[in-house]
C-alpha cells in the first residue's frame, strides 16, 4: 500500500484506496479477536493519558515559548527558552505553566518582546508573578495571540507541503525508500542527501549526534561537527529542507525529510519540525525510556504534546518497536512489538493523529540460523499489515545478526527487501551490508540502493499473488503472536487492578519490553516534571486540543 500524502485533503485521492476495516486481510484474522486487542490497548493506555493530562514538563513549556517565536541562545550556548523557563520556575514554580507569568510580565511592560524578557530574566532583573483577575485575562489573551501565530505558521507550512506534493507527486513505487544520511556536518549532509535522492531515496533521515536525546536543551544554529550523527537544530532543519526542495524540483517527486523528536526535548523538536516543514519524525517515548533511561512519566507527558503538534503539522510519526528486538529475541518477544504497536496506535489517535500518520515500526531481526526464519518474518510483517491496514508501516532492516560479513549482509538485506514488498510495507529503511563494521561509505549506500531497486523491480506486484494458506505456518504463527499479545495486555491490566498505578508503568518497570527495567520514580529528566496546579494554562495545548 502506497503511504498517503501527509495532508487530510489528499486522503481521498490516494493511488491505493484504504482497505476497509471489515476486510480480514490475507491472514483472515478474527475481527472479534482484533477488536478485543484494541479494546485492551485502550484500557491499558487510558491511565497513561490521564497521567499526561495531569502533568507538564520543562520541555512542554519551552516548546510553548518556541511556538511564540522565542529563539536564539546566550553567549554560553544555552537557549533563551531555557533561561526564561528557569527564571519563571525559580519565582513561581512550573505548576501553573509558563504562559501566565511570562505574558503578564510583557503586558506590564517589563520588556518589549520575549527575547528581551528572556535576557533580562537571565540577568535577574525581572521578577515573575501569577496574575489574577483582569491581569490574568490580559496575560491569557496575549499568550494565545502570540502562540496562535506560531501554530498558524505550522498550518502554513503544512499547506506548503500539500502544494509541493500536488506539484511534484509522490514516489511512483511502494514501499517508499528511506535512507539515513548524517556526517555530523550539515553542509556535508546536504549534498549527500541530494545524491541519495538521485539514486532513488524517497525519504532522507538525518540521524542525530550520539547523546543528543539526553540534552535538556536544543542546540542553536547550523552545526558542523557531531558524533555518529548531526545535531537536530532549527537551522539544520531549515537548511536540509531547502536542499531537498531543490531535489524535489530536479527529480519531479517530493523528497521527504525525517528527524528525531525523542529524548528530553521531544516537544520542542516537534515544534521546530512543524515550523520548518519536516515530513516524518521518529516519535516514541518507549525508546527513550528503555534505551536512554529517561523517566517514564516525563516522556509520556512529552510524547502526548509532541504528537498533538505532529497531528497539526501533518507529520507522519515513526515509532520504535524495532528497537525491542535488538535486545530481546525476535521470536520470543514478537508479541511485545504487537502490543507496543497497539498502544502506539491508541496514544497517537488520542493525540489527534490519523491512520495515514501512523508509521508503526517493526523489524527483520530473527536469527537467520533459526529454521523457517523467513517464514516467521513474513508472518510477523503480515500481522502488522493486517492489524493496521491504513497505516504507513515502517519496516526496519537486520542489524542484530549482521556479523561483518558483507556478502552475507547483502543477502540478508535482499531477503528483508523481499519480505517488505511481499507483505505490503509502506516505508522501507535501506539496510547496509556494512552494518556492524563501519559508518557507510557513499559506495555502500549506492550498492544498498541497487539491492532495493532490484528486488522491488523484480518482485513487481508479486504481493498480489502472495496468499498464505489459512491453516499454514505463516497464518498460524501470526495468530499465535496476536494471542500472546492479548495475554500480555491482560496481564498489564491485572497489574493495574492491584491499585499500584497505571499497569503499563509497572510492566515497564518489570522489564516487559526489551528486557530493560525502568521504574516510574527514576530516570533522567524526572526533576523536569510538575503536576498541574488549579488554574494551569497552556495556550498551545488549548489551541491544539480545540482542532
Tell where the protein language model's regions lie, with residue ranges.
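Helix-rich catalytic cores of soluble enzyme domains
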Residues: 140, 144-159, 168-173, 177-426, ...
